């Protein structure tokens, strides 16, 4: 009862128990000023530092060893031992055995291994014929999408989408693509470089030791300054024209040069240097590190060598052109210090700056750590931790300072700068180390500091690019924290962030521990090779285009004289001239040559006459040349230049009178027919001037006779002797008669001739087959009557001949003449045989099918029918005296019919083959005629 009362009377103890059972919640630390700690140890403190045995037992628990012996238990095991494999290689031989006749043969397959591309998951270019683009296009067109998916086509040059944006299934063990910054696969090039440099140094040392000369004076190093001398010469050459008038050294005043003649040659343009477009001087030097590595740190020429750069004239020129050379070229000290240093991995660095002066930190901590300074001076003492809160922030101390100044909170105590440099899409990292070297646990947190952004309006999205663990935490005494910062950006640019490392208790009197993150993301140039190739092609195309335009401009400026056209009548033959002068006659070479000889004969006979030149003599020549239309006024002047003025007037008057009489004679109709030539010329006379073609025959020299029969006749009519004139007219009329007849073509219709010959062969073979059958079957032979038909080739009627020359009307007359001839033949047959059909009626429809050119055959057929009708064969009148078996005759008829069908079939086949061959040859000839 007493215990219960006491429990009721003590509620505070119950509350304390409940609070003890509840989980302790962390309370934020309250910023309080630390109480002054005395440095003098009290008695209780000394006793607390004493080491007790109980504490040692807790740290190290003793382990007692067992002294008793354990019984030994033995067991037996059976182990299977395998025989060693035979190390010798087995040789396999293939033996071919004859297959059984029942074995099924498989078709040969030349497609090669089918799984050649399934292992890699795509078709390679060397596995197919042609390009992958065409193969994929054909597969898609045929609907084979499964095969089209196996074809992977590289992006073309103009594709702007990078390969990284396309999601592609990567194989599990595929190696990552090396970075463009990585060194080439020749990973031993640095080793080779060092090995060659070591050999070079050994060679230098051996030569200098053997020759007793320094390494810089060796002959192998004399060419090191050659590039520098050449550059200095170029600078002096460019500076000289500015010092003087420049006419002697400048090409501005020089005239343009000709390659060849000034009229037909080419004008050479000036170069870029002559026009003042000088390219900048290219400086090539060795960096100091390379000079040290090659063993030439201080190269100096020997004092006894009088080189180009030691000449007095050069020294004078340098002083004279010093100001101009300084403007043209920059200082050589700038290029000597240039050096390219790089590596193949993304770059990251850590830079630390301490902004607070160290005097202030030492003054604030000197009062509390006086005894520690004396201890640190002793080398044999172990460094002791700093009492109180303290951090090593990236190696820089950040201690707790007694008292705080509000102005220090605005300043930066320690600034750490983390720099990242990588390609877009690549990740790089850097570490920040913080060590708690004090005796107090320090609570920390990260706060982002705002910074002024001048391009805030241009930024569209705020994407996180820096990644690290920015949660708050506690650093215990002696603990080291590593903060890893990562940077990754999908686009190129320069990015920056600032963070503040806050601590509790506050260090450095409230000064900021700032971490600046600065990153540069570079663009990956994946199309560099393609771009260079495209630039090369465009440059070549541009050069070709410029050259073509320049050539076209040059060709437009060059004017060549036009080629003199050939005269229209340059290729006229004698036959063309004859047909033009005599349109109603037909040219025959032999007859025309005879007329030429006749003309020459009478001309010589006329020239041999020793008569005084009369006024009448030049009239025929004038008429001949005037009628021909080929004489020019210049020839007329030369023809009559020898005549006197009085004779010229008489000649002109008589010529005019002769033309008037000629026109009047042409207008009248002559009743008596003297010759065919005169009738043709009279009909042609009125239209002679109208039908004359406009082209004149100037280029061809006029012949002695102008090939005009009218002019020939007029010249003959002027002969004084009547016998000579009559003889010439007779020969002229005879020639005209021959020229009126059209010459037969040398080659007639080949198809007609071949068909006729084939038909004759068929008839001959039919007759021979009939005779053979009659002889075989024992039938009597038929009596054959042979008629000797006279050759009627020369018997041609004038209407038939006229039908070849004339057109429409002549054709109608020909038809009428043919009808009259048939009518006459029919009346003759009616008189001989009244009751039978006349052969004229039978031949009337066949005569229409015949060609108009084959007049010979028309006459022959008519005469043959007439003879057959007059003398019928004896077979048609008298029957056979011997009796013939009807069965044998029927068999003979059937065999003969079968033979006729076979012969006709062969005839049709041969005709079709020959017709096709002739049509092909005609087409070839027509094409050749068109080409010519």
UniProtKB/Swiss-Prot annotation:
Phosphoserine PTM sites in chain numbering: 559, 566
Gene3D superfamilies named in the record: Immunoglobulins
Region (Disordered) location: 1-39, 165-187, 789-886
Pfam families referenced in this protein's UniProt entry, alphabetically: MYCBPAP
GO terms classed as biological process: cell differentiation; chemical synaptic transmission; spermatogenesis
Stretches that traverse the bilayer: none
Residue spans of biased composition, Basic and acidic residues class: 165-178, 810-869
Location of the protein in the cell: Cytoplasm; Membrane
Compositionally biased spans, kind Polar residues: 795-806
UniProt keywords, alphabetically: Cytoplasm, Developmental protein, Differentiation, Membrane, Phosphoprotein, Spermatogenesis
Modified residues (Phosphothreonine): 560
GO cellular component: cytoplasm; membrane; synapse
Origin: domain of life: Eukaryota
Job description of the protein: May play a role in spermatogenesis. May be involved in synaptic processes.
Subunit architecture: Interacts with MYCBP.
Protein name (record): MYCBP-associated protein
Originating organism: Mus musculus (Mouse)
